[in-house]
Amino acid sequence: MVFSSIQAYLDSSNWQQAPPSNYNHDGTGASANGGHVLRPQLQPQQQPQQQPHPNGSGGGGGGGGGSIRAGSMVDRARQANVALPEAALKCPRCESTNTKFCYFNNYSLTQPRHFCKTCRRYWTRGGALRNVPVGGGCRRNRRTKSNSNNNNNSTATSNNTSFSSGNASTISTILSSHYGGNQESILSQILSPARLMNPTYNHLGDLTSNTKTDNNMSLLNYGGLSQDLRSIHMGASGGSLMSCVDEWRSASYHQQSSMGGGNLEDSSNPNPSANGFYSFESPRITSASISSALASQFSSVKVEDNPYKWVNVNGNCSSWNDLSAFGSSR
């Protein structure tokens, strides 16, 4: 004896579909009537699942109806008998069918939003100026642009570094070609202004606190005067000019000592010091008066015309005979 109704009763998919009151129809129970009672009740419930879908997509059994979430926009569109957007809609920008439906824009069933996987653009049908996708919306392109900007900045930095190194190499090449490339040889061709000064005004060396002496060569920081002194280029005749200056200094010293001017120089110390500086102990002439006299003398002379005219030294290395230019101001 085969009980055909037991399999239908034990099937878990039929438990919720069949109401409990149907199993005791006419008080006889399920075992008495068997499948004659259950089969007419199960068939009407399976028929709506086999009917075609209202939106025209076709019924796929119970699985198709269970994938739609209740209360979603798709469910609302089905209830309003609105056809769902096409799955393979052509992109209005690249004419590709590799597109997908995303969602309804602004919760409106008349503005479905799609995405093209080929050109990676979004577009919305029914919206204002949104039918054709125009630019933007692609994160990959923005990353590429940021990388290109970083590459441009690194290139500009490398160009500046190479330009500065090229300038340094050019300057070093010029110095080596003109001065021999040695620091001592460069300093040896620069004439110290203290060697050209009259021994009477040698106390001006005390006015320059920032004086660097190297092998009896010094650059006095007189402000604008120091730039003019640094621009003097002796060339190959530096040694002969130094000998002329030494000769001029000794002649000027003997001339002043023969004049007997005790107010200008102390005659008790005839020997100069080894470094080219002389003692000055006159109480009548102050450093301020000497500075003003030198400033007035230098302002009226152009260094470009004759670089040695500011110390009254001619090209033939003659001695300084005129002392009237530097008179004492009392």
Curated annotation (Swiss-Prot):
Gene Ontology biological process terms in this record: plasmodesmata-mediated intercellular transport; regulation of DNA-templated transcription; root radial pattern formation
Induction description: By cytokinin in procambium. Antagonized by the HD-ZIP III proteins and by mobile miR165 and miR166 microRNAs.
Principal localisation: nucleus
Disruption of the gene: reported phenotype: The pear1 pear2 tmo6 triple mutant variably displays reduced radial growth. The pear1 pear2 dof6 tmo6 quadruple mutant plants showed a greater uniform reduction in radial growth, associated with compromised symplastic trafficking.
Tissue: Specific to the vascular tissues. The PEAR proteins (e.g. DOF2.4, DOF5.1, DOF3.2, DOF1.1, DOF5.6 and DOF5.3) form a short-range concentration gradient that peaks at protophloem sieve elements (PSE).
InterPro entries for the chain: Dof, Znf_Dof
Pfam family, one: Zn_ribbon_Dof
The keyword Ribosomal protein is annotated on this UniProt entry: no
Biased composition (Polar residues): 14-25, 265-276
Keywords in alphabetical order: DNA-binding, Metal-binding, Nucleus, Transcription, Transcription regulation, Zinc, Zinc-finger
One GO molecular-function entry: transcription cis-regulatory region binding
Residues in Dof-type zinc fingers: 89-143
Bias kind Low complexity: ranges: 40-55, 146-165
Domain of life: Eukaryota
Disordered: annotated segments: 14-70, 133-165, 255-276
UniProt cross-references to PANTHER family, sorted A to Z: DOF ZINC FINGER PROTEIN DOF1.4-RELATED, DOF ZINC FINGER PROTEIN DOF2.4
Function: Transcription factor that binds specifically to a 5'-AA[AG]G-3' consensus core sequence. Probably involved in early processes for vascular development. The PEAR proteins (e.g. DOF2.4, DOF5.1, DOF3.2, DOF1.1, DOF5.6 and DOF5.3) activate gene expression that promotes radial growth of protophloem sieve elements. Triggers the transcription of HD-ZIP III genes, especially in the central domain of vascular tissue.
Record-given protein name: Dof zinc finger protein DOF2.4
